[in-house]
């Protein structure tokens, strides 16, 4: 510890500046810092600031060749975390010139690249980032955004419905296409490739794209509604990914998909640019996010990954349900849902939002709800997330005792009933079950679904609390 203290003294002298006034062009970060025993919070916070901006572990003569005061990222405020021993929120301001324009990759490499393995810290978590308008404006953002998507699909005034095709792995391309067709003709808007469906021996990507598009056009002709299937173009190289997106565009389908964390921000931004230039919507899956965001005291909170996705580009992103089988604490989830959809979001610590964020008219992203949800969840989902969301039922469609199309009908009927009830001024939170029961009296498909899932609950406390 003596050695550590000797090294970190320098950091505190240079990088802890509580009188610093933040600039409108600064990128601001809130880190949850857990110092090692014996390391004061100011020193730990200053060490984080230094190591993620201009500092290194010792004084170097080349420091004299530049203006460190201009480029250093100071730690300007530290506060203890309520209810936690030896945890602090350290606020760091980064000058805009430290970052390449329009590169999420570079932003993350700087801010979280090195500092998380630091010896002086027991744990470190990036809780939030404030992206200044000057930096936001260097990004294209989502290829199209919420309003343009609704106009393309001609769907207004309700959440969109989706379904992941199951079993996720093992179907042949033709059987996969059959499942897509059954779901789409039953009344949903989208079907989805599972995130791990890329191009495996049992189903190569080109065959899947062809059969899924055939299913989509057949369902469109039958229902008179515009349909989509998220064709997952994620691949081993960026070039192969773009090749798949080009093929999707040639088929004339409306939307493709990407796994943005496993695929990487550079690939994702390339694909987002291609999608805007070629009129494709882009659905984003967050596979691998829990590796980064699940631990409360170490990693990166999902709200930061969500902001980065809005900058990199995507029209939909999976973002927790509040109900169902996957994590999500209500206020915190709604906080980052607003950060995805809205143009201006006020600081609100009760929802985990550490900074006011102004997106200066960057298009919004539709949050996607998926994971263990079924018809009984519909009133809660409609109430909590409103119209601008995609509700994705995988097992909640394909698990219907009568098959895919009736499962889809049940979900659409439940959704329309909830939207109508809400528009009539009814309280979905209180009357939800009754609304579903009433709709089930004239929809045998919904009635059967209500029987199957009436008792299912996923009762675990959320780990992500304030």
UniProtKB/Swiss-Prot annotation:
Any one GO molecular function term: ribulose-bisphosphate carboxylase activity
Residues the record lists as N6,N6,N6-trimethyllysine modifications: 5
CDD domains, per the entry: RuBisCO_large_I
Keyword Glycosyltransferase: no
Cellular component per GO, a single term: chloroplast
Residues bearing PTM N6-carboxylysine: 192
Catalytic activity, reaction form: 2 (2R)-3-phosphoglycerate + 2 H(+) = D-ribulose 1,5-bisphosphate + CO2 + H2O; D-ribulose 1,5-bisphosphate + O2 = 2-phosphoglycolate + (2R)-3-phosphoglycerate + 2 H(+)
Subcellular location: Plastid, Chloroplast
Bound cofactor: record note: Binds 1 Mg(2+) ion per subunit.
Major location category of this protein: plastid
Gene3D superfamilies according to UniProt: Ribulose bisphosphate carboxylase, large subunit, C-terminal domain, RuBisCO large subunit, N-terminal domain
Annotated Mg(2+) binding sites: 192, 194-195
Entry binding sites for substrate: 114, 164, 168, 286, 318, 370
Broad enzyme group: lyase
Residue positions of the active site: 166 (proton acceptor), 285 (proton acceptor)
One BP term from GO: photorespiration
Record-stated family: Belongs to the RuBisCO large chain family. Type I subfamily.
Function: RuBisCO catalyzes two reactions: the carboxylation of D-ribulose 1,5-bisphosphate, the primary event in carbon dioxide fixation, as well as the oxidative fragmentation of the pentose substrate in the photorespiration process. Both reactions occur simultaneously and in competition at the same active site.
Protein name: Ribulose bisphosphate carboxylase large chain
Native species: Lobelia sp
């Amino acid at each position: 510890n003596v050695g550590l203290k000797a090294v970190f003294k320098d950091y505190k002298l240079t990088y802890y500046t509580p009188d610093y006034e933040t600039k409108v062009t600064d990128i601001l970060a809130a880190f949850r810092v857990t110092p090692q025993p014996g390391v004061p919070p100011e020193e730990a916070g200053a060490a984080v600031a230094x190591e993620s901006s201009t500092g290194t572990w010792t004084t170097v003569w080349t420091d004299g060749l530049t203006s460190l005061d201009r480029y250093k990222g100071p730690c300007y405020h530290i506060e203890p975390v309520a209810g936690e021993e030896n945890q602090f929120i350290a606020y760091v301001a980064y000058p805009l010139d430290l970052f390449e324009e329009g590169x999420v990759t570079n932003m993350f490499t700087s801010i979280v690249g090195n500092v998380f393995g630091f010896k002086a810290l027991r744990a470190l978590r990036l809780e939030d980032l404030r992206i200044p308008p000057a930096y936001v404006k260097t990004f294209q953002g989502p290829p199209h955004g919420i309003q343009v998507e609704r106009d393309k699909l001609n769907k207004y005034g309700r959440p969109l419905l989706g379904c992941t095709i199951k079993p996720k792995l093992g179907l042949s391309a033709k059987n996969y296409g059959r499942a897509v067709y059954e779901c789409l003709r039953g009344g949903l808007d989208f079907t989805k490739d599972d995130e791990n469906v890329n191009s495996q021996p049992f189903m190569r990507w080109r065959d899947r794209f062809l059969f899924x598009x055939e299913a989509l056009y057949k369902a469109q002709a039958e229902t008179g509604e515009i349909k989509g299937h998220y064709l997952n173009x994620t691949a081993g190289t960026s070039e192969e990914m773009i090749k798949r997106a080009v093929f999707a565009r040639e088929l004339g389908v409306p939307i493709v998909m990407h796994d943005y964390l496993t695929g990487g921000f550079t690939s994702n931004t390339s694909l987002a640019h291609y999608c805007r230039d070629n009129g494709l919507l882009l659905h984003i899956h967050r596979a691998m996010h829990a590796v980064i965001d699940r631990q409360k005291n170490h990693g990166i909170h999902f709200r930061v990954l969500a902001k980065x996705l809005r900058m990199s580009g995507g029209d939909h992103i999976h973002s927790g349900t509040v109900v169902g089988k996957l994590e999500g604490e209500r206020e915190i989830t709604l906080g980052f849902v607003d950060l995805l959809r809205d143009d201006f979001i006020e600081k609100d610590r009760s929802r985990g939002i550490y900074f006011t964020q102004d997106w200066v008219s960057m298009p919004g992203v539709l949050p996607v709800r998926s994971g263990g949800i079924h018809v009984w969840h519909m009133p809660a989902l409609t109430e909590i997330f409103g119209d601008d969301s995609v509700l994705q039922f995988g097992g909640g469609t394909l698990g219907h005792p009568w098959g895919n199309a009736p499962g889809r009908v049940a979900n659409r009927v439940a959704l329309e009933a909830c939207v109508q009830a809400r528009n009539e001024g009814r309280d979905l939170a209180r009357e939800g079950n009754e609304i579903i029961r009433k709709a089930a009296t004239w929809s045998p498909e919904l009635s059967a679904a209500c029987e199957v899932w009436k008792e299912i609950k996923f009762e675990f406390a959320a780990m992500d609390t304030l």
